[in-house]
Each structure stands twice: as structure tokens, then as C-alpha cells.
């Protein structure tokens, strides 16, 4: 019988600290630079990793502090996708949320400059020896089966199979890139 390598203590997403929310708002209003925003984010990630390790976790995440959504930021930054404003907002526990979504706008591919790579490299740099830093990304099913995100595939692909092949390759190449950066735990949500 094989032994399970990890015990799963958390998904990886944490509530965003108030300091991060405020820094994001200042960035959106042009009051601070992206570099200043990342400085705040990095300090909070460092504190979170310390807290995770202090509480006995052997696998740590960056809390997804670099994201505004748990899934959309990743997709917006793949080649061949764009953000847009949909008519209706998401519904979550009866509350309305933002109306931002994602849709196809070209051939799909890995983005070698994806900001999640930078975030992982920072996470890895503040993760103590013997602790595993993990990456979380949304599964490709969020493109295929949700919110009409794949409806425009025929504008860019000759067939559904060609679209799926490129989507699979984009994920493969992205995960390989994370691996090349030292990631040994990539979680698809």
C-alpha cells in the first residue's frame, strides 16, 4: 500500500489583510506604484508564511494575496484571455460581487511573464527549509464549463478539439514553468 505524502490542512486562500486591501485601493487610485503595492504584499506574505509554519503546517501558501479573485487573475494572465465586464455579478451568499469575468480573445498559450511566477518565487524565498511552498491555480474546467467563458472558441479555433489542445498545452507549460522555478506542489482548484 502506498503512503500519502501530504496531509491537507488548508486550501491555500486566506482572507486578505486590511493593509493589503488599503494598498490595493491606493494602487487603483494611482496613489502608490505597483512596486509599493508589491512591497506591502510581500511583507504580508512573509508574515503569513511565518504564521503557517508556527502553527505546524508543512505546506504553505502565499494566501493568494497577489490576487483579486481566487481564479480570474490566473486566467486573465494566460495568453489568449482578457478581462471584461459582464452584465450580472457573481452571487455569493446572497450578496452581489464585482462583474469582472474572463473570455477568450485569441489563441491560448502559457504566458512566460505570468505574475504568478513572480509571486511563487517570492513565496519560495521566504519558505523555511523543510517546508513546501505550494501554488494554487484554477482548473481548466473553469474555462470549459462555466459562465460561457469558452463560447468564443470558434472565433479563434477550427474545432473544439483544437481549443482544448491549446488549453491543455497552456496548463502543461504553465505547470512546467512552475516546476522549473522549484514548485513541487501545484494545486488545481
What name fits each language-model region?
Residues 1-189:
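Domain-level signal for soluble alpha/beta catalytic cores
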Amino acid at each position: 500500500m502506498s503512503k500519502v505524502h501530504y496531509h491537507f490542512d488548508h486550501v491555500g486562500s486566506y482572507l486578505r489583510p486590511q493593509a493589503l486591501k488599503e494598498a490595493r485601493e491606493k494602487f487603483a487610485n494611482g496613489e502608490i506604484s505597483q512596486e509599493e503595492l508589491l512591497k506591502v504584499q510581500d511583507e504580508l506574505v512573509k508574515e503569513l508564511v511565518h504564521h503557517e509554519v508556527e502553527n505546524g503546517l508543512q505546506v504553505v501558501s502565499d494566501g493568494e494575496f497577489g490576487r483579486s479573485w481566487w481564479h480570474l487573475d490566473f486566467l486573465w494572465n494566460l495568453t489568449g484571455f482578457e478581462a471584461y465586464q459582464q452584465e450580472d455579478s457573481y452571487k455569493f451568499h446572497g450578496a452581489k460581487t464585482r462583474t469582472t469575468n474572463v473570455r477568450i480573445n485569441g489563441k491560448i498559450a502559457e504566458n512566460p511573464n505570468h505574475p504568478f511566477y513572480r509571486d511563487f518565487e517570492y513565496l519560495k524565498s521566504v519558505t523555511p527549509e523543510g517546508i513546501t511552498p505550494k501554488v494554487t491555480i484554477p482548473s481548466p474546467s473553469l474555462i470549459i464549463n462555466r459562465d460561457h467563458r469558452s463560447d468564443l472558441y470558434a472565433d479563434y479555433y477550427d474545432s473544439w478539439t483544437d481549443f482544448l489542445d491549446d488549453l491543455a498545452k497552456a496548463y502543461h507549460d504553465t505547470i512546467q514553468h512552475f516546476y522549473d522555478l522549484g514548485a513541487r506542489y501545484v494545486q488545481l482548484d
